[in-house]
Amino acid sequence: MALLFNEEQRLLQETAQDYFQNNFSTKTLRQMRENQDALCYVPELWQQMVEMGWTGILATEEEGGLGFGFKGVGAVLEPAGKTLAGSPFLGTVVLGGSAIQLGGNGAQRAEWLAKIIGGEVRFALAIDETPRHDPNVCKTTATKNGGGYTLDGEKLFVMDGACADQLIVSATTEAGPTLFIVDAKAAGVTRHRLAMIDTRNAARIVFKNVQ
């Protein structure tokens, strides 16, 4: 089935193609790999993406975004992939933004989507506990504790997990699987950066008595 863009989406695609071709190359990736760059992306270039409005591609117009949906996401990710461009776009805008849109309450959507669009926060989706993705495995627990929860467990291969500001963590509660937004610097959160073959920023994250 053909993927047809409207005029605005075609303009986005052309802008993204020019931007990535002019600003990214395999040489950039190799330099970050050789320097063992902790972020695995260039903050100044990420800020330019924010200023171009790309962080609002997935959010609806009512949420303050562009409302381009996943067609818009594809228009950016395709040329990004061709140049091996590293950025928080996939982890923050696509995975983090989607999780908040689909699972967040009204207050959470209003707060966090605005911060994503404004480039104020970087998210990482922490859901895997095995070497291969298996959503049925979730040994991380969230125990009711007064007005909140206490998280205990471990997540593996968390993309952007070593540099994210906020984590979206899957945990098992009495009600079943639940997602929690956790400050990456909260007490009890320990992040271990992983050396990945694709040089992506990834981490093993341990949660011990996280409130």
Regions found by a protein language model. Name each.
Residues A126, D152-H192:
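A short core secondary-structure module
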Residues A85-A107:
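N-terminal glycine-rich flavin-associated loop
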Residues D134-D152:
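Cytochrome P450 C-terminal beta-domain/meander region
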Residues G103-E120:
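A generic, well-ordered mixed alpha/beta core segment in the N-terminal half of proteins
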Residues M1-L90, E111, K115:
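Amphipathic, small/basic residue-rich leader segments at the start of a protein or domain
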